[in-house]
Amino acid sequence: LSTLSLAIPAVGIGMAVQDTGTPYVVFVILALLCGLGGGAFASSMANIGFFFPKAQKGNALALNAGFGNLGVSVLQFTAPLVTGIALFTPLFGAPQTYLENGVQHQVWLQNAGFVWVPFILAAAVAAWVGMNDIASAKASFADQAVIFKRKHNWLMCWLYIGTFGSFIGFAAGFPLLMKGQFPDVDPSKYVFFGPLVGALARPVGGWLSD
């Protein structure tokens, strides 16, 4: 269900970017809904450790996190490709136009959201049918709420905000940095390399921790 819920912001973003009059608050709400994916990612990090012995937990966590971070690179690689073609026209909106050096260009920004919907639906069906849930790991909210009283939990949360939050921030800022420092270079062709290197490096950290 958490995977399926990601279809809401994917469709919402595809609709919102077609109207230049869309209020900023709408994009804030859509961004918050995208956080449902972050919640699924966090739960998978807690879940994957049950499938590996203690001596391999670091590598398991790193591989799982690396695959999650890889999504940033996949998005930055895919979005420039799909927004440049009439992938869903005329079903899901007309292209937007802009002028560059006196030449009119067309772009389909909505494709960056709509393109993920089939994959989200397929993943949701696969999870519903074949996910290996761990019955012994179930606990009530009261059982889980004990973590709020543990100082190490707060320390690790703060540390995680600094590390994973920095990764997301650097991935978002990299295109702007390239555009500002190298104005003659098209950043859309290279920005995916930044998060790609970060994602591929995570398994190394897991191996070292083991």
Please tell me what each predicted stretch does.
Residues 39-53:
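Intracellular juxtamembrane helix-capping segments at the cytosolic ends
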Residues 4-20:
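C-terminal ends and interior cores of transmembrane alpha-helices
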Residues 84, 117-137:
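C-terminal membrane-cytosol helix-exit motif in multi-pass small-molecule transporters
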Residues 1, 201-210:
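Helix-to-loop junctions at the C-terminal end of transmembrane segments
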Residues 9, 23-39:
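Hydrophobic core of transmembrane alpha-helices in multi-pass small-molecule transporters
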Residues 38, 58-84:
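Glycine-rich segments within core transmembrane alpha-helices of 12-TM secondary carriers
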Residues 151-205:
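Extracytoplasmic gate region of multi-pass secondary transporters
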Residues 132-157:
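Juxtamembrane intracellular "pre-TM" segments in multi-pass secondary transporters
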